[in-house]
């Protein structure tokens, strides 16, 4: 009888990928990056083991939103004080913290558990086209969509 392959944490080989977000749609880019972070693009994918790769996302400030989402979409956060609900429009978020906008979209597509938080730490988002991970020799990743 054959058994299903289960990757072991010490056997996993990690690569570094660079993704250019310029002109990409937020949700479509986020779903592909989340898939890479989880390791679903590998034949050795195992749901309970972190088999994913590191992803560097560049040009987060040039991400696109479809329709009227740039004016209508609202991001909420709470200060944990009474009456401390804060809201930010997507337009302001893209102008002030474009990295945060992309991080929220990608991390929202990862599992909500310890493994998902560990996978989310392999995400590196930059607003501009420069990054400081040249020592890891990242390779360009061509998006499917």
UniProtKB/Swiss-Prot annotation:
Keywords from the named record: Ribonucleoprotein, Ribosomal protein
Q: Name one GO cellular component term.
A: cytosolic large ribosomal subunit
UniProt KW Cell membrane keyword: no
Q: Which cysteines are joined by disulfide bonds?
A: none
Q: Name one GO biological process term.
A: negative regulation of translation
Keyword NAD attributed: no
GO MF terms listed in the record are:
mRNA binding; structural constituent of ribosome
Q: Pfam families per the record?
A: Ribosomal_L13 (PF00572)
What Gene3D superfamilies is this protein classified in?
Ribosomal protein L13 (3.90.1180.10)
* Source organism, top-level taxon: Bacteria
Family to which this protein belongs: Belongs to the universal ribosomal protein uL13 family.
Q: How does it assemble?
A: Part of the 50S ribosomal subunit.
Q: What does this protein do?
A: This protein is one of the early assembly proteins of the 50S ribosomal subunit, although it is not seen to bind rRNA by itself. It is important during the early stages of 50S assembly.
What's the protein here called?
Answer: Large ribosomal subunit protein uL13
This chain's source organism reads: Shouchella clausii (strain KSM-K16)
The upper taxonomy is: Bacteria, Bacillati, Bacillota, Bacilli, Bacillales
């Amino acid at each position: 009888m054959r058994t299903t392959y289960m990757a072991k944490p010490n056997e996993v080989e990690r690569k570094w990928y660079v993704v250019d977000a310029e002109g990409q749609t937020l949700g479509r880019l986020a779903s592909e990056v989340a898939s890479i972070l989880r390791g679903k693009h590998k034949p050795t994918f195992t749901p309970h083991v972190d088999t994913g790769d590191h992803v560097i996302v560049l040009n987060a400030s040039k991400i696109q939103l479809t329709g009227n989402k740039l004016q209508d979409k609202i991001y909420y956060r709470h200060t944990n004080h009474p009456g401390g609900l804060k809201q930010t429009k997507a337009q302001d978020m893209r102008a002030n913290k474009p990295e945060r906008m992309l991080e929220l979209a990608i991390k929202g597509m990862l599992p909500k558990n310890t493994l998902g938080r560990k996978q989310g730490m392999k995400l590196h988002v930059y607003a501009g086209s420069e990054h400081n991970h040249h020592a890891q020799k990242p390779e360009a990743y061509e998006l499917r969509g």
